[in-house]
């Protein structure tokens, strides 16, 4: 390799492209740090309040739902980002198709979860907890907007939404502890965080002068996405 080729292959740290990706990565790291910090502080507070038994029940319900939640996401995350990067003009078609696929997947996940709880003869209280928590899969459908900002290397919008919803839900958890709330309310707040996420993504999408009403479902696109993503679903469950 010539000296000129070597120079050309070096990273241009002063380029706009590098600055854009560096800033994007910094936003992602910042969100992870904030999430870990808040989860640690509030988590200890909540665990001490609930105690081993109640916290165990809540964790079990969340994990139980998690087994079926992968069906709702359909393993489409990286696939959709790839397609949006490849052809940004298909934005409404891709986001619309994935949105409706995730709605269908969420309904299937909810049905399978509830049926399984009865087959396993779970207690009434466990079924109630699981039934509340599994509704979060429906609200995760609008999170497809996250893929759009990932593809545009604008993760700051995702960080705004995710951090805001986390902070609000954490404050509510602290208030629940303060007012001696029952375990059911903590399950409701778990779902509320996803509701806040959906609302937040809707807002940032609208702020960027984009409309969800423009989304459209295209069967050929949906089939193509599922064909590419299905190998990722099983590993996600396991």
Predicted regions and their residues:
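Transmembrane-helix boundary and interhelical linker motifs in polytopic inner-membrane proteins
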Residues: 11-20, 50-54, 68-103, 150-157
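Hydrophobic alpha-helical transmembrane segments
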Residues: 130-134, 160-207, 224-228
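Interhelical loop/hinge segments that connect adjacent transmembrane helices in multipass membrane
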Residues: 2-17, 21, 156, 183-187, ...
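Interfacial helix-capping/hinge residues at the ends of transmembrane alpha-helices
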Residues: 43-44, 77-82, 143-146, 150, ...
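Signature of the first transmembrane helix
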Residues: 3, 17-77, 110, 114, ...
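Membrane-interface helix-capping segments at transmembrane helix termini in multi-pass transporters
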Residues: 15, 47-61, 86-97, 108-138, ...
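Alpha-helical transmembrane segments of multi-pass membrane proteins
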Residues: 67, 71, 103, 107, ...
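Alpha-helical transmembrane segments of integral membrane proteins
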Residues: 19, 23, 27, 96, ...
